[in-house]
């Protein structure tokens, strides 16, 4: 996939995030690895990734999911897509919360960049129709995540450390 095939809008809304250029590089690598793994045709597509804080994501989580608590990542697909199907040009939005991501990375002993890449991939798969509501869906989605992260030289995020 060429670097220009997918347009990624990055917005740092709130939170103590790294420099926007570094975030854009991490997001682009993660999205392109996912696109390649899924075998999607090169197509002009667009998505936005908003880097925010726990307070902002908690508001969205309460409004859209009925869960009044922060979460690490939310995805808002522009249009419904069946998992594995070629998406349209507008993919949707991924929102990521700094404090939750940082806390999870620390608690799980993972580099922040690896955890962030995982959440970008996770959110991107949601935009492409993947879900984890059932065990069968979770198995498929998590398998894809593992493959994509492996291509990025990131260890299995679901491996239980002893």
Curated annotation (Swiss-Prot):
PROSITE patterns: UPF0054
Binding-site list for Zn(2+): 122, 126, 132
Chief location category: cytoplasm
Enzyme Commission no: 3.1.-.-
GO BP term, pick one: rRNA processing
Cellular localization per UniProt: Cytoplasm
Cofactor: binding details: Binds 1 zinc ion.
A GO term for molecular function: zinc ion binding
Cellular-component GO terms for this entry: cytoplasm
SUPFAM superfamilies documented for this protein: Metalloproteases ('zincins'), catalytic domain
Record keyword Transmembrane present: no
Known function: Single strand-specific metallo-endoribonuclease involved in late-stage 70S ribosome quality control and in maturation of the 3' terminus of the 16S rRNA.
Family: Belongs to the endoribonuclease YbeY family.
Name of the protein: Endoribonuclease YbeY
Protein's gene: ybeY
């Amino acid at each position: 996939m060429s670097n220009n095939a997918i347009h990624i809008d990055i917005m740092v809304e709130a939170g103590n995030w790294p420099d926007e250029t570094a975030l854009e590089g991490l997001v682009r690598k993660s999205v392109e690895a996912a696109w390649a793994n899924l075998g999607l045709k090169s197509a002009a597509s667009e998505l936005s990734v908003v880097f925010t804080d726990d307070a902002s994501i908690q508001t969205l989580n309460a409004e859209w999911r009925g869960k009044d608590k922060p979460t690490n990542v939310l995805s808002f697909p522009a249009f419904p897509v069946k998992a594995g199907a070629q998406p349209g040009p507008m993919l949707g939005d991924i929102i990521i919360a700094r404090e939750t991501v940082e806390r999870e990375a620390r608690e799980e002993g993972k580099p922040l960049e690896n955890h962030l890449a995982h959440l970008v991939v996770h959110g991107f798969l949601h935009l492409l129709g993947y879900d984890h509501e059932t065990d069968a869906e979770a198995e498929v989605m998590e398998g894809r995540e593992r493959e994509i992260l492996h291509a990025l030289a990131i260890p299995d995020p679901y491996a239980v450390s002893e």
